[in-house]
């Protein structure tokens, strides 16, 4: 294909991405335990406490299931997260209570939503800038950092990854 057209179109890449992430939807968080801190911080905010005043163990108590699941390094630390991340975690805590399983599922779905929004925006921005949408999706979405870290590891950055390029499409 020497005419400059992409060898693979965006739809094929997005189906590939879907095939890669389906197994991750059903796994425990990969490579990190940050999600457990997100859950505890969300419960703190949902309970009307100040997450910047103390750590999850002090605010929720040693016996709270979400406080017990926070990695030792963060158990006594005040929240490092900003108000948007805490607000999202608070809504999830209100929906899921102390259920670690359902909290993880909800956060992972939000990670997927953030990455899906980024994929849509990356295609739109690539077209606007005269760049191959397939190449942009390949570099921006179908890479190990996004697949394993943001979706597998369930990180707040996945939501930001969606907000940022979507906002650029409105400029």
Regions found by a protein language model. Name each.
Residues 86, 90, 120-124, 165:
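Transmembrane alpha-helix boundary and packing residues in multipass membrane permease domains
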Residues 7-12, 122-143:
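Transmembrane-helix signature of polytopic, membrane-embedded enzymes
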